[in-house]
């Protein structure tokens, strides 16, 4: 019997594991539609930021009815805010479920730089899961929705502004804390959340605006709370006042309350208060005088913008314009505004300065390099036309690279990463070169590993006729002209325009057939007509590739090299022209011989003396 029970339990456990694995498999299919796990975490991080902006909207729900002197609620705002918050919390609950399944059932952790999931130990999982799971549960509990949806329709009692404020605050802190692990995971994989300096500066500016908006929302609710405190204090000073908490609700307010409340709390500026019985509203007097507490629900944008402006103004001014009463809560709120404004302003300025300095630092380095170059050229007494060419090259190189030393950066990488990076940079460009289209990927990879990026300014000479050819250039962008006077005769001249996809410096034939270590002599002069960017391979590297990869010696590749070689094209054109001229000369000489033969035959066949005399006379004439 015990064996059967054990067997039954074992089978049941297997079934549970199978169901869990099935659920995990379905979740993997859903998340498989995302490019990588990091993209999903970025999306969740964005949802958390949106949630931080939604929660303070609960503080705008209470209103004051200026006609009946009672409290009411913006029911439209209640519905909208509850729906949005529930949707975002549901989205985050999906993330929690996926996280728990992948981390507890099949222990996994943050993704690697390529999006691959890395397995962690159980001890690491316990330390990471406990705190974050508790924070996640607290942050997604629908406490504000329950409060505003259950108490408002019943109207059994007034929803205390203080309770609502502390509910939002108690969940706002966990919502901020839960963003930290997501932020660390995203920055660990991407290096930074912001992919550009402008986005980073905008993100810091958004956080500054968010804090201003949150302070404005708390100021709004505290103003209503202060108004309620004034009414209750006035009632406490009057012997015949019978106001209760429920009497302040609009559904229970009566005419007696209206007459009493109309004169109980006059709005007096703190500086003009002379009577000790007058209630001091402190820094909330602006909200009461402006009417934002008494506006209709359809005027919510006006209320929102005014409170946001109040928060932004006082955060930026560090609370210097705030005139508080002797209320401890009000003074503490003013202190928070002052300190947080100082910290946020310092963080904002520091981050913006960091993003700006990352670009201006290189500009300063470039300017310093220009000054050093000018000093060197003056010291060496470089001619003015050479100075202009040097300046033009430095400016062009800066525009293309922004001060990044590409070759030094590639050399600092590990070998496998360097080869993979070069393959990504050069392989597609190499395949666009007609000369290299017949090569397989292994040959192209060998060439990619030895290519270097080069830049040329206008009128720069790449190679001159009669000089040794040390590099072979593949053109990425720009126009060049290739000329030669080497044609086997005096006065010969040939020119060819080179564009993107062409190459110059015919080293392939030399690398394939020549046994000499001396570089070949260029038969052409190549000059840049515009700014040119390309990549080169040295003669030694090309010789090494030709030696190691014997497939370059195939007849098909050799014919293709000759077909695209400018030197072979020039020779072929010269041979064709010479053959055509020989053909024309032979044809002309043949025609002349035929005419001479006809004339000779005509003279021999004419036996008449008169004709001979007449012919001689005609010739004499």
Swiss-Prot record:
Binding site for a nucleoside 3',5'-cyclic phosphate: 435-556
Region (Calmodulin-binding), start-end ranges: 549-564
Residue intervals annotated with topology Extracellular: 65-76, 150-162, 220-329
Compartment(s): Cell membrane
Primary location: membrane
One GO-annotated biological process of the protein: defense response
Pfam families according to UniProt: Ion_trans
IQ domain segment(s): 569-598
Role, per record: Putative cyclic nucleotide-gated ion channel.
PANTHER family reported in the protein's UniProt record: CYCLIC NUCLEOTIDE-GATED ION CHANNEL 11, CYCLIC NUCLEOTIDE-GATED ION CHANNEL 15-RELATED-RELATED
Similarity annotation: Belongs to the cyclic nucleotide-gated cation channel (TC 1.A.1.5) family.
Record's comment describing the protein's domains: The binding of calmodulin to the C-terminus might interfere with cyclic nucleotide binding and thus channel activation.
Protein name: Cyclic nucleotide-gated ion channel 11
Species this protein is from: Arabidopsis thaliana
Upper lineage: Eukaryota, Viridiplantae, Streptophyta, Embryophyta, Tracheophyta
Gene: CNGC11
